[in-house]
């Protein structure tokens, strides 16, 4: 949980103070060495005494088999093996500051407790002290001075080097407390004590310190900020004489009671303020509640030794300190200078000492573990699992805050210059490639940011040197994979470290931690699954494996493309699919040109109105005369625009489509053909106007009494963009052909869109073209009557359908999305010029020329039954590309050049 903002400044000051009073690593190592040497030596002394007793007599051996006291388990010697229960020296345990992890700078006094089977005597103390000197010389080369303190029931060991540490070994036995309880209960003791038995009160105090250490490990060590606050307040007790009487066990109980009763974990600053509030409320006053000692059977006040004046002084000092903290003067309470308002962020180095003891636990006596206190407090068994989970989370969170690869490398090779080699990818997901030269070798790596790229470079350098990279704390496989493959494919636009995934099942994939930084994209900035689907439809992704626990799943997905299988892995199936698709794209389509991708932008599709056969397709925007060529949403019938195209049959400019049941024009929501109208009775009236964005040409053939307009063709200067609009044919009897209107066609090189779909039974007419690089021109010689079609399948089906109207006009409509037909009879010819040739139609000596840029121009040449040429009959299924149909039209010519 993040600390509350109002306590952030207090947290900084408390942690700064804590860092200043915390012992140095050298001091802790000296303590660790002295304690471990003494424990090993005492274990050897215990073995030596045990061998001596076994060699004496069977009588002494029988005496050693006495049943141990019941209360022994509460003193830390229970549940031991039978062979250890016969020993005179049961074990050695750490107590005091060493066991609790409360050592500060300058703390030179260390404590151990040596548990004995019987009441310790002066003779036993002398024997242990004498043999301890011998055993220490065998354990270590360090010199130690051993002193005997019979009055204190202890052995004192002092080292001869800096810092001058003093280790006190207290001798005690659980029998001392058991006998005292029997005396208090009024029982008569049948066994007389030896004359040289050690002081009973000293032995009881040693047993109490053992209980205190176990209680502290169970209750305070796992409490957030508790140990830190106790360390800071221990320093306060040393600096301020008023607080001196609280030093030790009362202070530890007070801090645990104050912090442990909070309803949430607190930061160091807030926890310290809560302890001050507890004291300021009068808890230590004579009429206050006092501090209950949980380690005593009888109700005991841990501050019972304080007199009235001391209690009042402590309460007043706490109130004054609380006022200072409330007004932002906590640094005065801590005895330090105020910190600047803004400090540079530094990696926390207090985490390793927050919740763990300063000295690792001893393994000398495996029979007396220090992790037993949770079993003694039965009422605390329920939250024990939570505490263990919290500790595990904290242990997992600690390693990433250690030195990373970049910091490690800078320590080993200071002054390295990192250079930016390249920056690729789109703006929203760039890929940076950094390099560094180390000992003449150049290393490169890439990442979604310069900082990450530098980190990946450092990982590579450290791996090359055979040194740890700092990522071992996490899952080694994932961490190393990410580092090794970080520079695999810098050309791919992917925020995580990019990996070249191959069809091998043992492929290496980026770690899940990096995939959270952003989406996985191809070098075209698209989702890999989407881009692969554009190239190969209907692919199936299969789940190959699912590994890891619930908190760390790993999915492997496989896809088969063109007979090859590609795999991808990730923390979920979506990520795994993306990497599998990415691998397939890199292997099968490494050099896909971007020119085609530019024409395949997503566009808003026109709503389908004619059923699946006339399904709308994405299209390129046309370039109209004076306005947008195509409205994304078709205008409803009978809309009145500038062209007045609805249900009005007239002649003149702007009328658009004349005739019944014809909706508005294809521009400006029913405004006819833009600002250009088509007059009737004009057989070869053509309009041509060129703009910077396209050339447009339209011709109209006038009809007789029907007044039908001719066909119009709009061609764009852009590749593959054109617009062809038909004119509705009129029957001789002025009956609309199936009540349908002609369809306009938009062509984008390889796909066309049938706009203005109406739910009428009318075939679609499209301009025909093939993609760039696939254009073909079709010409027909004299005397031939043939049909060519180059079409792409559309949802409407690939078949052709013939329509016959009153046995006078026969034409076929191709079901393809794009195709082309060219027809020629005797004496006719069709020309197709330019790099993107369209498909022209000609009949009866007419010619159709189309210019270089290849907008698809279409025209219709039809003769009525009375004309010199007639196309009819079973073999004369006639289809023109976007032909306009009108009766009694003459042959028209349309020339369009760039």
Swiss-Prot record:
Cross-link (Glycyl lysine isopeptide (Lys-Gly) (interchain with G-Cter in SUMO1)): 348
Example of a GO biological process term: defense response to virus
Biased composition (Gly residues): 644-661, 813-822, 835-845
Key words of the record: Acetylation, Antiviral defense, Cytoplasm, DNA-binding, Isopeptide bond, Methylation, Nucleus, Phosphoprotein, Repeat, RNA-binding, Transcription, Transcription regulation, Ubl conjugation
Described purpose of this protein according to its UniProt entry: RNA-binding protein that plays an essential role in the biogenesis of circular RNAs (circRNAs) which are produced by back-splicing circularization of pre-mRNAs. Within the nucleus, promotes circRNAs processing by stabilizing the regulatory elements residing in the flanking introns of the circularized exons. Plays thereby a role in the back-splicing of a subset of circRNAs. As a consequence, participates in a wide range of transcriptional and post-transcriptional processes. Binds to poly-U elements and AU-rich elements (AREs) in the 3'-UTR of target mRNAs.
Quaternary organization: Identified in a IGF2BP1-dependent mRNP granule complex containing untranslated mRNAs. Interacts with FUS and SMN. Interacts (via C-terminus) with PRMT1. Forms a complex with ILF2. Can also bind to PRKDC/XRCC7: this may stabilize the interaction of PRKDC/XRCC7 and the heterodimeric complex of XRCC6/KU70 and XRCC5/KU80. Forms a heteromeric complex with ZNF346 and ILF3. Found in a nuclear export complex with XPO5, ILF3, Ran and double-stranded RNA or double-stranded minihelix VA1 RNA. Found in a nuclear export complex with XPO5, RAN, ILF3, ZNF346 and double-stranded RNA.
This protein's name: Interleukin enhancer-binding factor 3
Name of the gene: Ilf3
